[in-house]
Curated annotation (Swiss-Prot):
Keyword hit for Ribonucleoprotein: yes
Keyword tags: Ribonucleoprotein, Ribosomal protein, RNA-binding, rRNA-binding
Organism per entry: Carboxydothermus hydrogenoformans (strain ATCC BAA-161 / DSM 6008 / Z-2901)
Protein's recorded name: Small ribosomal subunit protein uS17
Family matches, as CDD domains: Ribosomal_uS17
NCBIfam families from the UniProt entry: PRK05610.1, uS17_bact
A GO-annotated cellular component: cytosolic small ribosomal subunit
Length: 98
């Protein structure tokens, strides 16, 4: 009897898009300390495949687990949930207009 695999899906923020067809996604999770019960914020980075180079730094994306695509890449970008604000874009417009 075959077991159906549950696909892992995570939501995170793109922290780097310097590589070709690859982005680094930081996924943040809240965990409770086992002894003190304080909620701790933990961040883990995943390298994800971005086929069309559509993601930019600051975007919030949904990634899904897939077969190994390279030495460290085991995730792929499913969708871009929200576009991140590009820093410095407004400043450039002001200097051109003014």
């Amino acid at each position: 009897m075959e077991k159906k695999k549950v696909q892992k899906i995570k939501i995170g923020r793109v922290v780097s898009d310097k590589m070709d067809k690859t982005v680094v996604v930081a996924v943040e999770e809240l965990v409770s300390h086992p002894l003190y019960k304080k909620t701790i914020r933990r961040t883990k980075k995943f390298k994800a495949h971005d086929e069309h180079n559509a993601c930019r730094t600051g975007d919030i994306v949904k990634i899904a687990e897939t077969r190994p695509l390279s030495k460290e890449k085991r995730w792929r970008v499913v969708e871009i949930i929200e576009r991140g604000k590009v820093l410095g874009e407004e400043e450039n417009l002001e200097t051109i207009e003014g």
